[in-house]
Amino acid sequence: MDFLPDIEKFKNFFDGTDSKNEISIAVEEAKKYDIFNLISRVSALNLFHQNQTKSVILDTYIEGVLCQTRDQFPSKYTISSGKFRKIINQISDTSLKYSIDPPENMFVQNVMFYGNYRVLNGIDQTPAYNLQHMISVLFAKGIEYPKEFLDATYILVNGMLEISEKIVGGILNTENNHDTDEEKGIMIPSAMELNKYTELVITNGADFRKLFLNRIELLDLVTIEFGVQFEGDFDNKSFYTRPFLYNEEKDQYILLNAGLLPTAIVFWITCLAKKYGIFEEVLENYNDYIFHECQKYLCNLGHKKVLESQMGIDLFSSSGYKEYIASVQNNQLVIVQYLYDDGKNYNACTLHSTIEKKEFNDVVSKRLSYHYSKIIEYGVEKEDIFVIIIINSLGRGMAYGIKKYDYCYPPLRIHPFELMCISINEKAESVFIPRYLKAKNNLQTFIQVTSQYPFQAI
């Protein structure tokens, strides 16, 4: 099954020239005012949790501004609160509003790196989790990497987390009594309140350069300039990989969306790994680490690895795929398949992308068929076999299809972060995942039997 064309068709409904044309009037209006003041105010709106999912609109507007050349913004006039509100309401009422979903992610999460830091999740699902585990792989597991790579990575991660902590601390120390209403447009606070938040996204130039020890290669890695090519793609705005805009006149760095930082830090680490020729090694170590963490999560839920050789099973692994068999209770077993992004054809120019792992289509089905036959031959009933498919990547969505198989229960497809949460919240619940899969299967069967319409899995 080929998923990517359908995904692209859906994205094109909102992306590209339509979104660019809709915000073009608001971009022209911006040319009347001090562009750095205006753009920092737009960025500050992302710091209100009520606007967590509205970044799709705010980022598209910032992208529209950045695709202009710097000399198109000569004005020094500060925009009034009324004019600013008018612009935001204007872009909030475009077709982009139909792409907004209710927030599903925590607004703030913790990251440990020789101290405690807090980051904004933005609209990504697992940025803090990915960053925390990448930090562990590089600095806490005793794996040797080139000293120059580790030095550059340490400076980069430490500097960005310092900026993030300053921003989050400022947010949490400021009272926010605004209502959350997803049906309304972008929430715009009072001018005084917005000014306080605007200060949080601006860093003095000398302080910014000091954080990164004046290393030009790191400053260039994170800083963008005007005159970029417009990107209508929601997932890959031009500034997503370089989210800081430098105001040379005031010697200030403006963070264009604070929610980008945890994801961008991981991206920059991969860029540095490529520079030092260890990209594949870092990615493989990261995926191995996550695989072992997932085994711990499942163990906490009562699913311990079994000695599969006693059942005549030979485990298989390849680039992007691992597996093992775990216990449930009594005579029940769970087949665990781990699919991960091995970094092949990785594009170091984009923060997010979608890859089609066609090789998974065959290997997943073939291995499931193999395991089922061996386990049933060993004496386990088919209704006592469960399947968990863990899918892990760093910003790249993996599209694959599994051929229809005669399961008793459809496989549970899950991300390591979700599995970790379940292992914490449901630790006291006996065999939670198998019970969930049974209940889900019963619900689907009930709907198919009782509904006059064909069941649609969404």
Where are these regions (language model features)?
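Interfaces and regulatory segments of ATP-dependent nucleotide/adenylate/phosphodiester-chemistry enzymes
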Residues: K86-L301, A399-I458
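Hydrophobic beta-strand residues in large extracellular and virion-surface proteins
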Residues: L298, V306, V336, V387-I388
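Active-site beta-strand-loop-beta-strand hairpin of nuclease catalytic cores
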Residues: A326-Y346
